[in-house]
UniProtKB/Swiss-Prot annotation:
Subcellular location: Cytoplasm
Residues annotated as signal peptide: none
GO molecular function: ATP binding; ATP hydrolysis activity; ATP-dependent protein folding chaperone; unfolded protein binding
Function of the protein: Molecular chaperone. Has ATPase activity.
Gene name, Swiss-Prot/TrEMBL: htpG
KW Transcription regulation (keyword) present: no
Lineage: Bacteria, Pseudomonadati, Pseudomonadota, Alphaproteobacteria, Rickettsiales
Gene source species: Rickettsia rickettsii (strain Sheila Smith)
SMART domains linked to this entry: HATPase_c (SM00387)
Database matches in InterPro entries: HATPase_C_sf, Heat_shock_protein_90_CS, HSP90_C, Hsp90_fam, Hsp90_N, Ribosomal_Su5_D2-typ_SF
Protein name listed in UniProt: Chaperone protein HtpG
Length: 621
């Protein structure tokens, strides 16, 4: 027997070190992980056997067995699934193969208490065995192959892989050599209870050997949970299925179990988590809903079963209308799958709309966790934009709470027809922005957008139910203007611009190319000035984001709006009327201040500092 000794990847070593020294109280999850892996192995072979029946020749009844050998201090888990060859053992057990495990590593903080909490949150598969075992032996034979291989490790940095002449049928056997301090897991009654609690939803029969090791007792019903009538499933069974499926420690917030009958037949058992999922904004944006066809697991990767913006969903979809032998490639552009996706999307958005109306406090928590992902759908080419906007909520500047667009519209001031928003990084900073002081003074609400995605979706969705969605940074906002007064106000605006032409020309002449235009503001009430952009221009925050991402090279010149009622601006204007044009430093300081308030860079920080010092010096002398 040739034996090779290998070192674990550094990443695996980190996980094993945490498992071995774990203080995590719920160590029994190792059985959940190993049973889940065994079930997956059976599901994979069941799928492959649809196109190659020889893979299951002589043994087509899938099963998992669990046995306790108390005398030798061992727990033995056996399945007759796909099995592994030498390369599989090295790849699956010696390296990081699962993105969830990689994400687990990234989340480690170095704080042992917090890191042990993560074990339950992520589920780290096979490696959790080392929480209770000081040695693990894996014997496996891959379906369709003759060779048997043995993998063994004490979890201390190295493992061995060897060929074996052992008589062994297809599948995998895992022997856990239980630590002395964890010998309570060798108690038949306790282990039987653990296996039963984690296995009832597993579609593969799970058998438990009696204490004599002779008779097998089936512990689970071996029927997929989603195939049972809802009336026969308890809330606890739903919760356990969700936790096992999702490697989660939280309970689901919403459970959706539906059987769709008609032109397209499918069953869905879907969950919305109550806590934020760790991989929600992972670059690959993976979706975590498993596709089954007639109870046979097909895939949970690279299939367009749910839209990306609903990737927080967990669960299964089981179709009756797709052929079992369909290739994963064929699933990419499949009309039946597209109809299932549309039906699920409609159902989920409908459920969210109902929750938003019935349980606003709970919905606020959901939105804090998943609102950012949901709004990504507003940037996609989908027919669901209005339905998505119906379930969106935003921070109200006027009422300091989360409200929907429909609530915003219901509270329109007389003559108002536009939905106003302001985007930025921090809601508290936005509340003190000059951009919205005039609107708020007239009790016109402004929605505060603080997610990066907000700057993108507003470029795709300029209206909601015929009402324009408009940034408060736009130049043509007049807080006094109403529908009934618009004609008169337009005349007044022209008169105001003419009256203050001396002022605006002076600012433009002083600032030159730093500004595009200088205008008299119709939205400022106390601040001296603010930056603004025209309706045709890119939003200020969006432009800044694209510069940071190196999508565009330089910032464009903005408009500068002046408040003639402000004492500083009034003083400059009066000086101009008296033919005093010695306020250039003050004009530059006002512009720099407007840039700072808008998060824009100051062109010359040295000059800005000098101007500020000069003004302070004059004030105190």
């Amino acid at each position: 027997m040739i034996q090779e000794k290998k070192k674990f990847d550094a990443e695996v070593g980190k996980i094993l070190n945490l498992m071995i020294h774990s203080l995590y109280s719920n160590k029994e999850i190792f059985m959940r992980e190993l049973i889940s892996n065994a079930s997956d192995a059976c599901d994979k072979l069941r799928y492959l056997s649809q196109s190659n029946s020889e893979l299951v020749a002589g043994d087509s009844n899938f099963k998992i067995t669990v046995k306790v050998d108390k005398d030798n201090g061992q727990i033995i888990i056996r399945d007759n699934g796909i099995g592994m060859n030498k390369d599989d053992l090295i790849e699956n057990l010696g390296t990081i193969a699962r993105s969830g495990t990689a994400n687990f590593l990234k989340s480690l903080s170095g704080d042992s208490k917090k890191d042990n909490m993560l074990i339950g949150q992520f589920g780290v598969g096979f490696y959790s065995s080392f929480m209770v075992a000081d040695k693990v032996t894996v014997t496996s034979r891959k379906a369709g192959e003759d060779k048997v291989h043995i993998w063994e490790s004490d979890g201390l940095g190295e493992y061995t892989v060897s060929d074996s002449d052992k008589e062994f049928t297809r599948g995998t056997e895992i022997i856990l050599h239980i630590k002395k301090e964890e010998d309570t897991f060798l108690d038949h009654f306790r282990l039987k209870h653990i296996v039963k609690s984690y296995s009832d939803h597993i579609a593969v029969p799970i058998y438990f050997f009696d204490e004599a090791g002779n008779n097998e007792i089936q512990l689970n019903s071996a029927s997929a949970l989603w195939t049972r009538p809802k009336s026969e499933i308890t809330e606890e069974q739903y919760k356990e299925f969700y936790k096992s499926l999702s490697y989660a420690i939280d309970d689901p917030w919403i459970t959706m179990h539906n059987k769709n009958e008609g032109a397209i037949e499918f069953t869905n058992l879907l969950f919305i988590p109550s806590s934020k999922t760790f991989d929600l904004f992972h670059p690959d944006r993976k979706r975590r809903v498993k596709l089954y066809i007639k109870r046979v697991f097909i895939s949970d990767e690279n299939i367009d079963l749910i839209p990306s913006y609903l990737r927080f969903l967990r669960g299964v979809v089981d179709s009756e209308d797709l052929p079992l032998n369909i290739s994963r490639e064929s699933l990419q552009h499949n009309s039946v799958l597209e109809k299932i996706k549309n039906a699920i999307t409609k159902r989920v958005l409908g459920e969210l709309r109902k929750k938003k109306e019935e349980s606003p406090e709970e919905y606020n928590k959901f939105w804090a966790n998943f609102g950012g992902a949901l709004k990504e759908g507003l940037c996609e080419a989908t027919t669901n934009h209005e339905k998505l906007l119906e379930v969106c909520i935003f921070r109200s500047a006027l009422h300091n709470k989360m409200i929907s667009l429909d609530e915003y519209i219901a509270n329109f001031k007389e003559g108002q027809s536009t939905i106003y928003y302001l985007s930025g990084d921090n809601p508290d900073k936005l509340l003190s922005s000059p951009q919205i002081e005039g609107l708020l003074s007239k009790k016109i609400d402004v929605l505060l957008f603080t997610d990066t995605v907000d700057d993108f979706w507003v470029n795709v969705n300029s209206k909601y139910k015929e009402h324009a969605i408009k940034s408060a940074t736009r130049s043509d906002i007049d807080v006094e203007q109403t529908t009934s007064q618009s004609e008169a106000k337009n005349t007044d605006s022209k008169k105001s611009d003419d009256e203050y032409k001396l002022l605006t020309d002076y600012f433009k002449e002083t600032l030159g190319e730093l500004v595009k235009e200088v205008k008299i503001s119709k939205k400022l009430t106390s601040s001296p000035a603010c930056l603004a952009v025209s309706d045709a221009a890119m939003d200020i925050r969006m432009e800044r984001f694209l510069i940071e991402q190196k999508q565009i090279a330089n910032a464009s010149a903005k408009n500068l709006e002046l408040n003639p009622k402000n004492k500083i601006i009034e003083k400059i204007f009066n000086d101009l009327k008296a033919n005093n044009k010695n306020n250039e430093e003050l004009v530059n300081l006002i512009f720099d201040q407007a840039c700072i308030l808008e998060g824009e860079p100051v062109a010359d920080t040295g000059a800005f500092s000098k101007r500020l010092n000069d003004i302070v010096q004059k004030a105190i002398l």
